[in-house]
């Protein structure tokens, strides 16, 4: 269950991050990227950064729930109507499947790393210290002003935690 939920959630994050990043790259007319996969990676990081910062901003007024990824996914569906974004995505998809050895190797690497990560214990001290608590708090209450006065670990706020907090509901709760 955990492995499938992680694969699904990362697919969802890719789905709403890449078109948003491509929109930004197309608005700024970025054409110096020689390889198409470089543009894919950069558009993913731009998209997920924008999503994380928007969610961090909105967490002051709203609880981080599963409606945020739904709204970003609907916006991504709207962005897929753009011809430039659609052509970039179809070009990547064709290149990925034409180079079957890279695709099969990537799938094997992805699955083996997921199996390794899911079967190894979490040894990071700070994960249990404030990451998990912060994610739980954001998914249940959003930003609460003055919460750091209770304990200093609660005062750490990360935009990446807001992305995870929006996905920490229902079937996926405590699975990521």
What are these regions (language model features)?
Residues 2-3, 36-37, 107, 113-114, ...:
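Generic signal for short, ordered secondary-structure residues
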Residues 25-29, 103-108, 132-137:
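Short hydrophobic/aromatic-rich motifs at helix boundaries and adjacent loops
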Residues 26, 31, 65, 82-83, ...:
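Detector for Asparagine
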Residues 113-176:
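Active-site lumenal/periplasmic loops and adjacent helix-entry segments of GT-C-fold
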Residues 45, 49, 103-107, 155:
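A generic short alpha-helical patch detector that favors 3-5-residue windows
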Residues 97-118:
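Internal/C-terminal transmembrane anchor helices
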Residues 1-94:
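Membrane-embedded, hydrophobic transmembrane alpha-helices
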């Amino acid at each position: 269950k955990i492995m499938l939920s992680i694969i699904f959630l990362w697919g969802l994050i890719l789905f709403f991050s890449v078109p948003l990043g491509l929109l930004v790259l197309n608005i700024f007319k970025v054409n110096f990227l020689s390889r198409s996969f470089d543009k894919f990676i950069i558009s993913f990081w731009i998209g997920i950064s924008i999503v994380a910062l928007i969610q961090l901003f909105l967490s002051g007024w709203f609880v981080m729930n599963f409606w945020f990824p739904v709204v970003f996914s609907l916006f991504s569906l709207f962005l897929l109507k753009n011809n430039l974004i659609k052509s970039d995505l179809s070009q990547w998809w064709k290149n990925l499947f034409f180079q079957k050895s890279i695709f099969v190797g990537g799938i094997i690497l992805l699955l083996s790393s997921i199996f390794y990560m899911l079967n190894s214990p979490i040894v990071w001290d700070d994960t249990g210290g404030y990451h998990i608590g912060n994610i739980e708090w954001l998914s249940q209450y959003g930003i609460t002003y003055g919460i750091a006065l209770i304990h200093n670990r609660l005062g750490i706020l990360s935009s990446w935690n807001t992305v995870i907090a929006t996905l920490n509901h229902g079937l996926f709760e405590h699975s990521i």
